[in-house]
Amino acid sequence: EEQEAYTYDVDKAKELMKEAGYEDGFKLTLWGDNTTQEIKGMTFISQQLAQIGIEVDVQPMEPATVSDKIYVDKEDAEINMWYVNWSASDFTMDGSLRSLLYSTMCPPTSANTAYFNDADFDKDMDEGLATANEEEQAKYYGDAQKIAWEACPWLFLGNDQIIYSTKSYLSGVYVSPDGAFNFANATLAQ
């Protein structure tokens, strides 16, 4: 099921900041990998948040350094924001959501850096994993996705479009959602 896109409303955001006691804004740190794409994304986020008084210190780092800083016990966590790309290489809803948002999948063993904890979300994830019926899976995972979208523990910004081509004599090449190429079934026409 498709979700309605989040709305862009600077005035509403300022109003919510005021209600939360942050009328004068605040400062935070945004971590991410030091690739050109990641730095551009983090810079864009910092520009957007500046409009509502949030001063962002963008800190691009080597991926291993980001990982070392992210995957620590909660009491040692220093994370404010993390700019990250994610895809489900296994092509399952469970793979898309469980490690990011399931209540027990927090650092240091997994990526729920929002420390999201929603019993209904967890129940839907468990029910989806427990059944082999595709219609039931679609319902449970759809419900879990709706909970995550509405709670917004992470801000889901967009989807990359992976475009690739092959020669007409090559078949069986597959590209996963994370951009990895799979040549296991590749064949060349004679």
Map each language-model feature to its residues.
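Short, solvent-exposed loop/beta-turn-alpha elements that line the ligand-binding surface or hinge
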Residues: 1-11, 22, 71-77, 98-126, ...
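Short, solvent-exposed loop/turn and secondary-structure capping segments
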Residues: 41-42, 93-97, 169
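Hydrophobic, well-ordered secondary-structure elements that form the walls
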Residues: 30, 49, 70, 97, ...
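Append "and occasionally in soluble cytosolic enzymes with long acidic Gly/Pro-rich linkers
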Residues: 1-47, 51, 120-123, 139, ...
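Periplasmic binding protein-like
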Residues: 47-104, 140
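Hydrophobic alpha-helix feature that most strongly marks membrane-spanning transmembrane helices
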Residues: 50, 54, 71, 75, ...
